[in-house]
């Protein structure tokens, strides 16, 4: 009741934040004259002065006004650009670890320089994160002169970069790169076998450009480094032939069945489900194809992999459509990002779905993969000490940013008032009527000399509009995932008078449509342009620019609403940049996906009750409210899915932290002899306790079993029964000590043969390899657990609690296995001296071979579904150590050599090299 009154009196929270920062802006402005009077050298020396003051105890907040004033003055001298007051507010917002929402064309790239410069002074590194490599290079090279003028180094991390370059980039004061590359480098660092191989420093401060795209749109997409699993391409092809024989079961909302079938589709959740009839029929088909034994159930434990293939095939055929969710290019299935409309090369769907689509399209089926390391952006970016972000559209997701990342959103005022007109939506009964109205609107704008940007949700829609325009004889450009290579050229001319550009959501990120076109692109196209040519190009552009301004600026037409209001706002934001005139209009129909799936029948009945005729549109608040309600419903559902994914991944993340900490401790240690001793003690205690229960009678002891496990796990044959027969005073504790001493003696003998230094290095390599292999298998087991944990709900159990409980048990088993298997490999392995150069070359070759087999995936998953992969068969020992494990009995050093030479083993084949 009093909220509106209080807001009127004191302003909104956002207004109060902006007002607070305006005081600091005044402090920066007060220093402008002083900075103007400094020479270039004096201005540059301010950086070293700030660093010295920080070392003496001053804080970044205390030097902020001066640092911002220095950065602003350097921007004027080097770039010819002066930071506006609102940009200073944006810089302060970033420095405070918040998200700055800034409209299109307000200079986010320049804003970032303020917070980046200030935080780079601490010498701990600053990461600037972009959504693609093009923007990373563009922004780094664009701002490099400014940073280097101020004495700071700039690096760029890119895929397939030589290790030396990558390490140098991370050692720079400021590092630019994509979210994918930063995330993959983090995972790769935690697979390194020496500290020298690691690239990243401690994660200090990151500024994320297009933060909503990375932290929200990409949140459900884990980063995965994977190796190849078994090949099952033939099975995908066989299943693919069976899927078309299944029919869809269609049922109206009133429960009336309009078509009997084998499966149903839920368009809201994008899920497909076999019914009872479908299960029986697919079992018959699988049996006929020889894939399922006669009389067996598809739900038998050993057939669950087959069931997964069936569902993957169903989803590939019924939920994924060519030119909508993916395109086929160069005999490869390339996924399309629903938020940007761009293709995502290298990204593959998990759970065998990508292979099923390849089978559907008749392409070569790529092998499945097994996860070696994974994380999510949600958990990776929360590792930074301080995080900040910039975007043009964050306010609609402010609650999620605060809940998940503890990042408040501050809406930064525009430098000039927004002059764009956003017209009401026009809703038609059919898509045909809607597209006819769009063509009519385009005609009108062309006659006025206004440029038009037509935004579509899919490639199909963009090509349909293109065909309609061709039929009318209108010249136009199409920008979608098929023509992305021409993006810069098309966008550069999209603001010319009368230009018509049809684009999917691609045109929403990192691009500005300049009214009149982009004269700089024209100049760049000329080789060695003269001053006269440049002047003429500028003059021509000025005429076109004025012509478009007088006509009303850029007009944005959207052919349908997106699931997210944020994506709609991004499209609108293409028009009206920096106070320019412009307008936007959304054209909808009752046949659009969002309206069909989420808007209630009430809207349809309401429109029909009005007696609307063909071609008529409706502009009514009730319809607009229904659309916004549908969008909020979808946004809420997507938020719940992301939150659920995070809750599950948080469990794995805590385990990941423990394993990576253990790994880093091993890498940092000069030698791990004490760790090996602890592993041996714990593994031995567990083995003895399993065969000699505490406080048990000698009659209950399993001595043969203990002797067997000591040989299998510790590589030493010990006559325990003989000891007990010869010494009646031996009891549980003294026997334990005697066994431990015998194992130590055997291991010390191995150390004498190989040399202490060589064995210490070997121990570290073995423990790291065992840890990596068992962690890989643990990830696979966790995937399987998460995939089926929702079924516990049918037993009245909480799936999340069950997942936490079982994953904790699995993790305890993992830690025990690391200790036991490390000792097992070290006990069995035959160590020989090796030339250091040869050893380094061998390890390097192994690392290169491993890298060749790795795949870097950013695979789409749901909160509960992960890849169904068979865990690698390790049989108690890591693959890398198999070649080193003895299969023959151990030969004593003083025994005759088995080669038949007559010499003792230690003087023949057992001689230390």
From Swiss-Prot:
Residues annotated to bind ATP: 87, 105-109, 512
SUPFAM superfamilies per the UniProt record, alphabetical: Helical scaffold and wing domains of SecA, P-loop containing nucleoside triphosphate hydrolases, Pre-protein crosslinking domain of SecA
Domain of life: Bacteria
Cofactor note: May bind 1 zinc ion per subunit.
Pfam families listed in its UniProt record: P-loop_SecA, SEC-C, SecA_DEAD, SecA_PP_bind, SecA_SW
Gene3D superfamilies, A to Z: Helical scaffold and wing domains of SecA, P-loop containing nucleotide triphosphate hydrolases, SecA, preprotein cross-linking domain
Keywords, sorted A to Z: ATP-binding, Cell inner membrane, Cell membrane, Cytoplasm, Membrane, Metal-binding, Nucleotide-binding, Protein transport, Translocase, Translocation, Transport, Zinc
A GO BP entry: intracellular protein transmembrane transport
Segments of this protein annotated with the region Disordered: 864-913
Mode of membrane association: Peripheral membrane protein
UniProt binding sites for Zn(2+): 897, 899, 908-909
Record's GO cellular component terms: cell envelope Sec protein transport complex; cytosol; plasma membrane
Main subcellular location of this protein, as a coarse class: membrane
Secretion signal span: none
EC number(s) from the headed UniProt entry: 7.4.2.8
Subcellular location: Cell inner membrane; Cytoplasm
Entry cofactors: Zn(2+)
InterPro entries: Helicase_ATP-bd, Helicase_C-like, P-loop_NTPase, SEC_C_motif, SecA, SecA_CS, SecA_DEAD, SecA_motor_DEAD
Catalytic reaction(s) noted: ATP + H2O + cellular proteinSide 1 = ADP + phosphate + cellular proteinSide 2
GO molecular function: ATP binding; metal ion binding; protein-exporting ATPase activity
Compositional bias of kind Basic residues: 903-913
Described function: Part of the Sec protein translocase complex. Interacts with the SecYEG preprotein conducting channel. Has a central role in coupling the hydrolysis of ATP to the transfer of proteins into and across the cell membrane, serving both as a receptor for the preprotein-SecB complex and as an ATP-driven molecular motor driving the stepwise translocation of polypeptide chains across the membrane.
HAMAP family: SecA
Family the entry assigns: Belongs to the SecA family.
Assembly and interaction partners: Monomer and homodimer. Part of the essential Sec protein translocation apparatus which comprises SecA, SecYEG and auxiliary proteins SecDF-YajC and YidC.
Name the UniProt record assigns to this protein: Protein translocase subunit SecA
Name of encoding gene: secA
């Amino acid at each position: 009741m009093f909220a509106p009154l209080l807001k009127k009196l004191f302003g909104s929270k956002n207004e109060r934040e902006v007002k607070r920062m305006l005081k600091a802006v005044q402090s920066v402005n007060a220093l402008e004259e002083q900075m103007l009077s400094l020479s270039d050298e004096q201005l540059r020396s301010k950086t070293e002065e700030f660093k010295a003051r920080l070392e003496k105890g001053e804080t970044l907040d205390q030097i902020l006004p001066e640092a911002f004033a220095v950065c602003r003055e350097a921007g004027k001298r080097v770039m010819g650009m002066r930071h506006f007051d609102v940009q200073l507010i944006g810089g302060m917002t970033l420095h405070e670890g918040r998200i700055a929402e800034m409209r299109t064309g307000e200079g986010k790239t320049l804003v970032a320089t303020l917070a980046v410069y200030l935080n780079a002074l601490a010498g701990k590194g600053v990461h600037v994160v972009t959504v693609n490599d093009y923007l990373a290079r563009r922004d780094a090279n664009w701002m490099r002169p400014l940073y280097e003028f101020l004495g700071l180094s700039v690096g760029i991390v890119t895929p397939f970069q030589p290790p030396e370059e990558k390490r140098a980039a991370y050692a720079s004061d400021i590092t630019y790169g994509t979210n994918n590359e930063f995330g993959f480098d983090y995972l790769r660092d935690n697979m390194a076998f020496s500290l020298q191989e690691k690239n990243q420093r401690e994660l200090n401060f990151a500024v994320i450009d297009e933060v909503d795209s990375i932290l929200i749109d990409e949140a459900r997409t884990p980063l995965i480094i994977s190796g190849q699993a078994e090949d099952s391409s033939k099975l995908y092809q066989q299943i693919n032939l069976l899927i078309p024989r299944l029919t869809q079961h269609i049922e109206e909302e009133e429960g009336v069945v309009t078509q009997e079938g084998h499966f149903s589709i839920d368009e809201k959740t994008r899920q497909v489900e076999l019914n009872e009839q479908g299960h029986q029929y697919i079992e018959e088909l699988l049996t006929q194809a020889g894939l399922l034994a006669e009389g067996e159930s598809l739900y038998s434990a050993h057939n669950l992999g087959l069931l997964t293939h069936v569902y993957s095939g169903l989803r590939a055929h019924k939920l994924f459509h060519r030119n909508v969710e993916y395109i086929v290019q160069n005999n490869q299935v390339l996924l399309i990002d629903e938020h940007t409309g761009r293709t995502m090369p290298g990204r593959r769907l998990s759970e065998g779905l990508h292979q099923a689509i390849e089978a559907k399209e008749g392409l070569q089926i790529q092998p499945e993969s097994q996860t070696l390391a994974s994380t999510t952006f949600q958990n990776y970016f929360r590792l930074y000490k301080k995080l900040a972000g910039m975007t043009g559209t964050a306010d609609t997701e402010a609650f999620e940013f605060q809940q998940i990342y503890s990042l408040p959103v501050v809406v930064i005022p525009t430098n000039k008032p927004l002059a764009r007109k956003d017209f009401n939506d026009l809703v038609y009964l059919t898509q045909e009527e809607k597209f006819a109205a769009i063509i009519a609107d385009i005609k009108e704008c062309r006659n006025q000399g206004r440029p038009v940007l037509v935004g579509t949700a899919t490639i199909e829609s963009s090509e349909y509009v293109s065909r309609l325009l061709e039929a009318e004889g209108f010249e136009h450009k199409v920008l979608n995932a098929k023509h992305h290579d021409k993006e810069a050229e098309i966008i550069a001319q999209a603001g010319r008078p009368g230009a018509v550009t049809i684009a999917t959501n691609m045109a929403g990120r990192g691009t500005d449509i300049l009214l009149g076109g982009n004269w700089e692109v024209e100049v760049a196209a000329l080789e060695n342009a003269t001053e006269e040519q440049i002047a003429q190009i500028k003059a021509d552009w000025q005429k076109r620019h004025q012509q478009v301004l007088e006509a009303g600026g850029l007009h944005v037409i959207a052919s349908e609403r997106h699931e997210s209001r944020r994506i709609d706002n991004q499209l609108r934001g293409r028009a009206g940049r920096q106070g320019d005139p412009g307008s936007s209009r959304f054209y909808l129909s009752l046949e659009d996906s969002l309206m069909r799936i989420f808007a209630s029948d009430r809207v349809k009945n309401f429109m029909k009750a009005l007696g609307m005729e063909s071609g008529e549109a409706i502009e009514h608040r009730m319809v607009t409210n229904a659309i916004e309600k549908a969008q909020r419903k979808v946004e809420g559902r997507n938020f719940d899915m992301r939150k659920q994914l995070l809750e599950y991944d948080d469990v794995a993340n805590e385990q990941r932290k423990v394993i990576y900490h253990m790994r880093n401790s091993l890498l940092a240690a000069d030698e791990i002899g004490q760790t090996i001793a602890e592993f041996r003690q714990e593994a031995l205690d567990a083995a003895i306790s399993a065969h000699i229960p505490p406080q048990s009678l000698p009659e209950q002891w399993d001595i043969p079993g203990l002797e067997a496990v000591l040989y299998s796990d510790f590589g030493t044959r010990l006559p325990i029964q003989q000891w007990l027969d010869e010494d009646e005073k031996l009891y549980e504790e003294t026997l334990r000590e005697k066994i431990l001493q015998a194992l130590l003696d055997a291991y010390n003998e191995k150390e004498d043969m190989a040399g202490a230094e060589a064995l210490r290095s070997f121990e570290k390599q073995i423990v790291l390899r065992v840890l990596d292999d068992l962690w890989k298998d643990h990830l696979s087991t966790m995937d399987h657990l998460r995939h089926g944990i929702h079924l516990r709900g049918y037993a009245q159990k909480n799936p999340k609690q069950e997942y936490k409980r079982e994953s904790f048990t699995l993790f305890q088993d993992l830690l025990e296995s690391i200790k036991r298997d490390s000792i097992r490999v070290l006990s069995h392995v035959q160590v020989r001296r090796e030339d250091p150069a040869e050893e380094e070359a061998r390890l390097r070759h192994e690392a290169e071979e491993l890298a060749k087999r790795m795949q870097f995936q950013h695979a789409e998953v749901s909160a509960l579904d992960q890849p169904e992969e068979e865990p690698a068969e390790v049989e108690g020992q890591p693959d890398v150590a198999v070649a080193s494990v003895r299969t023959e009995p151990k030969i004593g050093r003083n025994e005759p050599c088995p080669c038949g030479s007559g010499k003792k083993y230690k003087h023949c084949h057992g001689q230390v090299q």
